[in-house]
Amino acid sequence: MYRSQKLSLRYYTAAVTLFGVMILFGLLSALYYLYPSLLFNIFNFNMSKILHIDTLVIWLLMGFLGAVYWYLPKELGREVEGMWLAELTFWVFCAVVAVVAAVFLFVQYGGANEFSMWFINQGRKYVEAPRWASIGIVAVMLVFAYNVIATCIKARKMTGIMWVLVLDLIPLVAVYLDAFPAVTNMSVDLYWWWWLVHMWVESTWEVLIGCVMALVLMDVMGTSRRIVETWLYIEVMLVLGAGILGLGHHYFWIGTPQYWLSIGGFFSALEPLPLLGMVVHAIYDAGTHRLKTKNQPAYYWITTEALLNFIGAGIWGFMMTLPQINLFSHGTQWTVSHGHFAFYGAYVCGIIAVLYVAKQQTSGVDMLGGRAWKWGFGLLNFGMVGMVMGLLLAGMAQAFYGRAIGGSTLMAFTTASENPWFVSGMWARMLFGAVFAAGYVVLVYDLLTSPKRVSVPHAQPEPA
């Protein structure tokens, strides 16, 4: 095993741990909607929500880094350059996360001054981490970029996947710098803040997960490099076009020009199509050439990634980004429904797939299967779909009673929040969240359990 792959296992361990923390604070946040005075003046709703969202971003980022460190030496045929720096920044990353979590748990608030912005909370959603921590994350990403680029140079080898990954590193680092400006004009602040949220999380991450899925498909299913690289190029083209212009659906109601209404409404739904096409084409190719996967859990999570990314980010996103609908749906649980479905389909399923790839290759079994992974797979997916539908029900109740009928007043918001349809949706979110948490427990158990050794004959694929 390469030294970088051992580092990858550390990243996976940290990511799965933070996945559990995210679920814990997600359940707590769900309880606040049902019992608003819960932990009043001890640990309020907004801090629970911050920890839920921020740990989501960080555990996925750690999963991405782990996946690249796992596949980079396999793709280029040599150890990753600058491993001592990579290992150092891993521990720095973990320390930053631990300190920020402690500040959010025990300090929580600060005054409206520079000290609070630097050491307590920047006050911007998704990037609430104090400024020193954001600088630490930039340092981690710069070292990661150095590791990838220096390894490619030393190996004197570049594949199509590596070209896409290297080019994606530029916006991956640069766009995160939008976390730093502190602008007093709310419209200007939101204008650039959405570059961070949309372009960093929804665009550069889409390309990054595309690179990871391309490597996983070749590894798990023996898919032709020509197929995955072709779809990866299509994804880059769509991100450059639809991804950037799709940013417009965030610009409907923040004081930007009216032309964003038509631009944002159309282009938002195109982003998930290449990843869906890549996986569907890979499955078709595997059937044509009679290829068989040796890793059932990874295979099922890959196909789930493609399907739920298309539904969650594509269909769920498109049905609420049309400006005629978004006028009523924005800022409701309808948006939260889309957010849960999109993140889960676009990223979570893919990271779980690479976890099972690592499990198989570290345990040395020819065929990875079993029963526990099926329970984890079923509970996680059933729990997520249930949460999404519950949130959609609650969001539609808010859009109808609070916006369309009530006229978006404070009284209308309160009335909608007490509506039986809204309350039922939030109870469904809570109960299915518990199912999702049970799936997480089974997933962790299965990842930590040694698989049975079952030898299988290696199928010889027909030439592509």
Place the predicted regions along the sequence by residue.
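Extramembrane terminal tails and long inter-domain/linker segments of multi-pass membrane proteins
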Residues: 1-9, 398-422, 450-464
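N-terminal regions that are enriched for targeting/export leaders
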Residues: 1-46
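Interfacial and helix-entry/exit segments of alpha-helical transmembrane bundles
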Residues: 8-18, 81-94, 160-171, 221-242, ...
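Membrane-interface helix-loop-helix modules in multi-pass inner-membrane proteins
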Residues: 27-34, 40, 47-152, 179-186, ...
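Transmembrane alpha-helix entry/boundary detector in multi-pass membrane proteins
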Residues: 43-57, 194-202, 257-268, 329-347
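Hydrophobic cores of alpha-helical transmembrane segments in multi-pass inner/ER membrane proteins
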Residues: 54-68, 132-147, 200-216, 269-283, ...
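Membrane-embedded translocation segments of transport machinery
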Residues: 193, 197, 209-327, 335
